C-alpha cells in the first residue's frame, strides 16, 4: 500500500472526490448514518491515504492539538469494504501514529466506535471509560501515550 500524507490544499479534485466517496460509502451508506460527513474540519486536517494501484483503500485524518480535541487526534478511520481483512486499517493507523510521533506529540485521542475496541486496543490505545452516542452510534474516548 502506497501512503500519502497531504494537507487539504494539496488535494486534486479527483483525490478529494475519491476520499469523500469512500467516507460516504462507509460512514453514511454502510453504517446507515444519515448525518453530515462534511464537517468543515477537513481544511485543518492532515490527510493520510493508503492506495493500491491508484485506488484509495484506507484513510485517516490527523489533527494537531486544539484543532479538534485538546490533544492531537486521529479520526475518520476508514478502509474500503473490498479491501478489509488485509490489515490495511492497522497499516494506515500505524502510519498515522508514526506521523504524530514525528511531529513531537506526546499523546493521541480518538473517538472510537465501541465495536472496534479490540482493533484500537491492539494498536496501543486505552479506553478512558467515557462512552457516548455520536451520530446515533456508540463511541468511546480512547487515548495513547506516544513517549
Write out the residue ranges for each language-model feature.
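A short beta-turn/loop motif at secondary-structure boundaries
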Residues: 38-43, 66, 133-134
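A conserved beta-turn-beta hairpin within the catalytic core of GNAT-like acetyltransferases
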Residues: 64-74, 84, 134-139
Amino acid at each position: 500500500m502506497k501512503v500519502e500524507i497531504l494537507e487539504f490544499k494539496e488535494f486534486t479534485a479527483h483525490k478529494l472526490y475519491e476520499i469523500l466517496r469512500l467516507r460516504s460509502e462507509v460512514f453514511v451508506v454502510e453504517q446507515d448514518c444519515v448525518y453530515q460527513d462534511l464537517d468543515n474540519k477537513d481544511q485543518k486536517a492532515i490527510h493520510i491515504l493508503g492506495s493500491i494501484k491508484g485506488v484509495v483503500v484506507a484513510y485517516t485524518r490527523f489533527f494537531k492539538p486544539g484543532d479538534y480535541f485538546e490533544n492531537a487526534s486521529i479520526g475518520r478511520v476508514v478502509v474500503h469494504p473490498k479491501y478489509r481483512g488485509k490489515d490495511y486499517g492497522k497499516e494506515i493507523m500505524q502510519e498515522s501514529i508514526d506521523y504524530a510521533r514525528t511531529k513531537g506529540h506526546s499523546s493521541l485521542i480518538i473517538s472510537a466506535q465501541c465495536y472496534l475496541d479490540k482493533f484500537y486496543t491492539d494498536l496501543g490505545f486505552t479506553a478512558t471509560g467515557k462512552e457516548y452516542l455520536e451520530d446515533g452510534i456508540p463511541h468511546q474516548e480512547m487515548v495513547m501515550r506516544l513517549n
